C-alpha cells in the first residue's frame, strides 16, 4: 500500500515519521512544492532574519532521516490534481502517482493586500524559506520598515527589524496587538516592551494605499490621512488555507478541509492535517482550524495511528509560543468563553501569569518569562466534562 503525503511542512513530515513509528512498512512518498529540504518554520520570523542562524541550521529532521526511514521526498514537485476515482495524484510536470491513502498537509498561504500600490517592489510576505531569504536581504537595504498586522508573526518580524537598527512601525487594525491569541494583559505588556525598544504602534489604524517612487514603496497611507515613510512593508494580516485540491476533488470544505476525529475527509481514502484541516478540537469544543506547530504534530500522530490501526494518542491542550525581545511568551489551552481571569504581573521583570477559568475549571494559561511555571500548569488543564 502506498501512502502519498502532499506537503512537506511539520504536519506532513511528522505524519511520515509516525507512520514508521507505528510500524507501517509500505511506500511513503512526500511531495513538496519547494526546492529545499523540509525545514522548521518558527525561526524564519526570528533569528533567521537577523542572520543569527543560517538556512542549514533549521532542518525539520536530521540528515539521513528520509533515507533511514525509507521515505521518498520529491522536492520542487507541486501536486496539481487528484483523481479520486483512480486514486491518483498528478504533479505539475504531468506525472501520475497512485495512492492507497492520501494525506493532504498543504500549508496556509499569506493573505495578500489588494489596495492601491500593493504590487510595488518592497511589499513582502513571510510564509516560506524563499520568503524569509528575500526579506532578510531587503532588511539589510532598508532603513524604515512598516509591519502590517500586530499578530504573533508581525511582532516577531518587527522585533527582528528593530534589533537590526531599523525604524519600525506596526500598523494594526484592532485596538490591541495579538488580539486573537492572548489576553489584554499579555498584549499590553508585550506592546509596552516593544515600544521601549523603539517600535511605534498605530492601533485602530487601517491602510488605504501605498505610494511609491520608481516602482518601489515609499509611504503607507492610513485611513486617517496619515502617511508613514517605508522602504520596506512586511504584510502579516493572516493566512488562507489552500483548498484547491480538496475542492476539485469534491471533498467537504469549510474554511479548511473538514475531517473527523481520525483526520479522515468525506472521502475515506483521503485525510487532511495541519494548516488545511478543519477538525474538532476537544479543548475548544468545536470544529476549528489552527495554524500552530502543536496542532500540526498532533494531527500527524492521529492520522498515522488511524491508518495503522493503533490507539489514538490522548489529546493534549493546544499551545503556542513566541520570543519577542527577551519575552518568552507561552500559551496553553483554549482561551475562549472564560468567566474569570486571574492575572499576576511584574512590570519590572517582565513576568506575567494569566489563568483563565470557566465555571471554576482552568481552561487556559498564559505566561511571559515563566517557562517552569507554564510547564507545571500544563497538567492542570483538563478536557471539558
Swiss-Prot record:
It is found in: Cytoplasm. Pathway: Hydrocarbon metabolism; alkane degradation. One of its GO terms (biological process) is alkane catabolic process. GO terms for molecular function: flavin adenine dinucleotide binding; oxidoreductase activity, acting on NAD(P)H; rubredoxin-NAD+ reductase activity; rubredoxin-NADP+ reductase activity. FAD binds at residues 8-11, 32-33, 79, 156, 275, 293. Its EC number is 1.18.1.1. Pfam families: Pyr_redox_2, Reductase_C. It comes from the Bacteria. Keywords: Cytoplasm, FAD, Flavoprotein, NAD, Oxidoreductase, Plasmid. The keyword Oxidoreductase applies. Induction: Induced by AlkS. It catalyses: 2 reduced [rubredoxin] + NAD(+) + H(+) = 2 oxidized [rubredoxin] + NADH. GO terms for cellular component: cytoplasm. Its cofactor is FAD. Homodimer. PANTHER family: APOPTOSIS-INDUCING FACTOR 1, RIESKE DOMAIN-CONTAINING PROTEIN-RELATED. Belongs to the FAD-dependent oxidoreductase family. Involved in the hydrocarbon hydroxylating system, which transfers electrons from NADH to rubredoxin reductase and then through rubredoxin to alkane 1 monooxygenase. This is Rubredoxin-NAD(+) reductase. The gene is alkT.
